[in-house]
A protein has these predicted regions:
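Domain-scale detector for complete catalytic domains at protein termini or as standalone homologs
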Residues: 3-35, 47-52, 69, 81-85, ...
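Gly/Ser/Thr-rich phosphate-binding loops and adjoining beta-strand/alpha-helix segments
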Residues: 6-10, 16-19, 31-63, 79-95, ...
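Acyl-group handling in specialized metabolite and lipid biosynthesis
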Residues: 38-41, 49-56, 104-118, 197
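Acyl activation and transfer enzymes in specialized metabolism, enriched
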Residues: 49-74, 186-205
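Active-site loop/lid in soluble adenylation, ligation, and acyl-transfer enzymes
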Residues: 63-65, 69-81, 87, 104, ...
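Helical lid/core segments from catalytic subdomains that handle acyl or acyl-like groups
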Residues: 101-156
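Histidine-centered acyl-transfer/condensation active-site motif
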Residues: 140-155, 170-207
Length: 216
């Protein structure tokens, strides 16, 4: 479960001129929109992911989050993010994971994406356990964050309207997976800022995610 990133990237977070990027037109159209977020929902065949987790003793959500990060490395738009009325370029990605801490509330941590799954899994376990124990969130300001939320208390068909007006990051959310005969299914909702990417980018991302799961 190792793969080499296909993206040529810079060395640090930096502000860029939107007009010098492929997002110039979209940035002008959407950066001041009162509701610039779009949500897609796709039902994934996660049978392969489920079997790999069972066979190797890997946590389902850990491997799923790694696959999400892996799919994002295939598109340059994931290394751009609008903040306020500016556009920033990043050199790396991280996955935000929400956990229930010991005081009964929630907090989160930004787990750095690595092409090496086992490195990612080690960071995931360490950072989520620290968040649970300390009841404090940790943030990586130098990475483009892919938000996630696993609400596994029930099965969910779709999750929408997560826009806060503060966080413009791509956000993926899901409920409990569903078993049907010899298949395991999981609807996943993806919210994205239209200044960062178009619907075609998001659709391709979801397709890439399915293919990565299929080839674990």
């Amino acid at each position: 479960m190792q793969a080499k990133s296909e993206i040529g990237i810079t060395t640090m977070k930096q502000e860029v001129n939107p007009q010098d990027t492929s997002r110039a037109k979209a940035f002008g159209l959407w950066i001041k929109s009162p509701m610039p977020m779009v949500t897609f929902t796709k039902t994934f065949d996660v049978t392969r992911l489920y079997k790999v987790c069972k066979r190797r003793g890997v946590k389902f959500n850990t491997l799923l989050c790694w696959c999400m990060g892996r799919a994002a490395t295939r598109q340059r738009v994931f290394y751009l993010l609008p903040e306020g009325e500016k556009l920033y370029k990043y050199d790396r990605l991280a996955i935000n994971v929400i956990v229930n801490h010991k005081k009964g509330d929630i907090c989160s941590c930004d787990v750095p994406y690595s092409d090496d799954f086992y490195q990612f899994a080690a960071d995931y376990d360490r950072m989520t356990q620290t968040a649970i124990d300390t009841c404090e969130s940790s943030f990586d300001e130098e990475a483009m964050i892919i938000g996630t939320s696993a609400m596994t208390a029930t099965q969910l068909d779709s999750i929408v309207n997560q826009y806060s007006g503060v966080f413009n990051n791509p956000f993926l959310a899901w409920g409990r997976y569903r078993k049907s005969w010899f298949k395991v299914w999981l609807p996943i909702s993806m919210q994205f800022h239209h200044a960062q990417m178009d619907g075609g980018h998001a659709a391709q991302y979801l397709e890439d995610l399915q293919q990565i799961i299929n080839h674990l």
